[in-house]
Amino acid sequence: VYSCLDALTGAYIINKVPRFDIKTDRELETQEKYYVCDIAMRNAVMRDEGVGFEAQLENVLCNEMLQRGFKLYVGKQGQSQIDFMAVRGQDRTYLNCCETVLDKETVKKEFGPLTRIRDNYFKMVLSMDGETIVNKGGIINFPFISFLVGG
């Protein structure tokens, strides 16, 4: 399986994003995630698999951050996951993305892991909601589309 994944990565069909343990501040050697380089290909291949909209948003965000020159990791914070830890130079940005933050369960799922990170790097939740909201803990909810076109 890994040789096939390596071949697909080498052919620029998929991107490998390693997992990073935020608490211990180290890259993990297992449980990496893979994202397709072309979201249209992903949709064509998985059209009948019931792939969720949020998974598509995550894939688009991965491609965008790589295009902007960031090194990406999937963040691990205890039992929780951060969609991406984007690193460029000495700077880090923690990113979660979701369809909406208008229900309490999603707010808990998306903001909760970010509030438990005890460093001062930028933390953001990107959603399809139209407004920018700053959470009490300094975490910004920013419109996904606005982020893609200019953020």
Roles of regions detected by a PLM:
Residues 74, 120-127:
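Short, hydrophobic beta-strand segments that form beta-sheet elements in well-ordered domains
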Residues 90-103, 110:
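Active-site ExK catalytic segment of metal-dependent nucleases
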Residues 112-121:
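Arginine/glycine-rich "motif VI" loop of SF2 helicases in the C-terminal RecA-like domain
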